[in-house]
């Protein structure tokens, strides 16, 4: 399962991912198993036990959603864990501690000195063997990590491996959108760095008709395209090198790229920042940061969404966590909701975008909200 949920002071802040796996868990329990073992990761503890990344705070919310008691174990592998699982009876549900507390889960980590280290292959083999010993059948309902070659994904050696309901639902929505979308197909991309989204941009250019690029990554494109002065806005040096290649592919594939034409800027990232509108002609002065789409860009984005029949959105349009820099993202969401009401298919993915949707209480107003975070 993917219980990698945000915590605040030891309490689950957003239970969406936990709730997403409840139907699969309940279905398995209907078959009267001897026991059910749940394994997940949380955060990035880099192969070490870090208490703030413990899965224990997930327990109360999981018990509440299931309406039954769940046993929590302080580790995920080893003799004690195997014995506890072996002695489970009457459909006992067991939640293991964070898989990523062990370097063998990801195969690599960062040590206390900040050096990158690799796991010992023999230890990885033992880790995977111990995970395998915890059950007879393997169910994968963790869409958010299904793309990773981690031990819990690829190293649990059971002949019968089954996709859970959540994984099935995610794959159905994305395969429909990518393989047989109702055209026009628009993808909206945001976030900070171009290089983090290279694969996504590349693959989407094979499928879409129009692409809106916003958020921090837009400034890297605008710097390359127009030599725009971007002040202190986000700039991705690595991504800058491949902008031409991406735009050339878009041209070949006849994909219309929409970049911001104006920006709401701040002199800091804080809620009390002074703000000003700048555009392609003026550029952004030194000491100022592009933090949201400007009014002209918001209007142009609305036009693109209004003509789309399939919409996939991954990444906000600005620093929406601060109210004054929220308009670009919240207005876009309103337009996506309006278009969904009139028949478009809308899929929202990416952790920040999903957070926006939940804050606006709009999860049931779009076609599908993915649990996959960046994996979406």
From Swiss-Prot:
Superkingdom of this protein's organism: Eukaryota
Gene Ontology biological process: gluconeogenesis; glycolytic process
Sequence positions that bind CDP: 191, 196, 215, 315, 320
Positions bound to AMP: 192-193, 197, 216, 290, 321
GO molecular function: ADP binding; ATP binding; metal ion binding; phosphoglycerate kinase activity
Keyword Cell membrane: no
Binding-site residues, (2R)-3-phosphoglycerate: 1-4, 17, 40-41, 43-44, 99-100, 147-148
Subunit field text: Monomer.
Record-given protein name: Phosphoglycerate kinase
Organism whose genome encodes this protein: Glaucoma chattoni
